[in-house]
């Protein structure tokens, strides 16, 4: 199984890339994280948020690994604790499907994509920069893995 993070946005500051890389390099070979950046659509010329999200949805769908479990990150998604994520990981690994975490653009994710997702998950009740969400998600995936391995990184 491979973990994918599909994120609308590119040209992130160096500290975002450094933070993200720090956690992805810690992951074991059997649970690698791959980032796929999706170029955001321009919201110019009176273009509606709906048309921007629909265009971004098409790009996201083209980048999704075939057959992957889709976990869409959304402010109205389910609140999971780190322990719940850690409990989900072994089941996902046994099922063998890749898992694609999807981070939307400035306007969020298209409703069609959210409806198609296997899980809607909220990272935080606070509004966060999308680049920071990449770092937080990578850290939480590493922490969840460390819990499943009784690794000392996580101290409950």
From Swiss-Prot:
Record-level GO cellular component terms: cytoplasm
Main location (coarse class): cytoplasm
Gene3D superfamilies the UniProt entry points to: 3.40.1280.10
Keyword annotations of the record: Cytoplasm, Methyltransferase, rRNA processing, S-adenosyl-L-methionine, Transferase
Keyword Phosphoprotein on entry: no
One Gene Ontology MF term: rRNA (pseudouridine-N3-)-methyltransferase activity
Subcellular location: Cytoplasm
Stored SUPFAM superfamilies: alpha/beta knot
InterPro entries named among the record's database cross-references: Alpha/beta_knot_MTases, RlmH-like, tRNA_m1G_MTases_N
Reactions catalysed according to its record: pseudouridine(1915) in 23S rRNA + S-adenosyl-L-methionine = N(3)-methylpseudouridine(1915) in 23S rRNA + S-adenosyl-L-homocysteine + H(+)
Enzyme Commission identifier(s): 2.1.1.177
Binding site for S-adenosyl-L-methionine: 73, 104, 123-128
HAMAP family: 23SrRNA_methyltr_H
Summary of the function given for this chain in its UniProt record: Specifically methylates the pseudouridine at position 1915 (m3Psi1915) in 23S rRNA.
Similarity-based family: Belongs to the RNA methyltransferase RlmH family.
Assembly, per entry: Homodimer.
Descriptive protein name: Ribosomal RNA large subunit methyltransferase H
